[in-house]
A protein has these predicted regions:
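A short, conserved, highly charged catalytic patch centered on acidic carboxylates
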Residues: 1-96, 103-122
Length: 122
């Protein structure tokens, strides 16, 4: 078990949860994000399917600005993983997406209006 500082409860420490908790701690401790602007396992508003975003980051006005999709370290980050996070973003329409397995991280900036994206160096 590990204490999730966002949900304020202990959760089962699976490999994916290890990645999520380490990324959350990085956001708070290194990125300076206030815990109150970070959501965990937030339900996607796009579809009626029971899908949840691993991490959703808001700006200081409360608007969502970034989705983080966490995978277990043994999962290869491929097109299927990106398709998943892009699908989640149809409901949130955030400008930034991050995919991580704790070992490899990809970030991209989304230009929703022009249907383009740009990978960022992280």
């Amino acid at each position: 078990m590990i204490l999730d500082p966002i949900r304020k409860k202990y959760v089962r420490l699976t490999p994916e949860e290890w990645v999520r908790q380490n990324f959350i701690r990085y956001l708070i401790n290194e990125g300076g994000y206030p815990p109150g602007l970070i959501g965990v396992e937030v339900k996607s508003r796009f579809s009626n399917l029971n899908r949840r975003v691993d991490i959703l980051i808001h700006d200081r006005t409360g608007a969502p600005v970034m989705i983080v999709e966490c995978k277990s370290p043994e999962i290869t980050l491929n097109d299927k993983v990106f398709d998943q996070i892009v699908c989640y973003n149809l409901g949130f329409r955030v400008p930034y997406l991050i995919v991580t397995n704790g070992l490899v991280h990809y970030a991209c900036r989304i230009d929703i209006e022009n249907n383009k994206y740009e990978f960022l160096h992280v």
